[in-house]
């Protein structure tokens, strides 16, 4: 069975850009983010449905970190099969690191390379060939390799 801890990692390429996405996965992912997210709608994440996006502010105690979009995926209907929160923030390296370091301090740990996909495999969200195809898709450098990897992922429909 997958580790019981909560993992975090940058889901977008490292470096500066317009936005960055930080992914958090684990049974308590939603609970770790909720106290630090001020939704524009004033709803707490714990009361929100799966597969929803919420505009708001991420804070670090009394200090605001960034205006963000938080996307919520509840287990088992997520990529990993666990509760997943994706934080879309402004893409400066400073903001990315501030958010990562903050949640590491809240008990998350940095995900190892491929660990989100490993958890998906261990939760029966995909088979081994599909998990390997995800790595191939990420590494694809041309249309042919992209299409081949994509076809391998969808040979059998995943259980989402």
Language-model features: locations:
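Residue-level detector of conserved catalytic or cofactor/ligand-binding positions
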Residues: 151-160
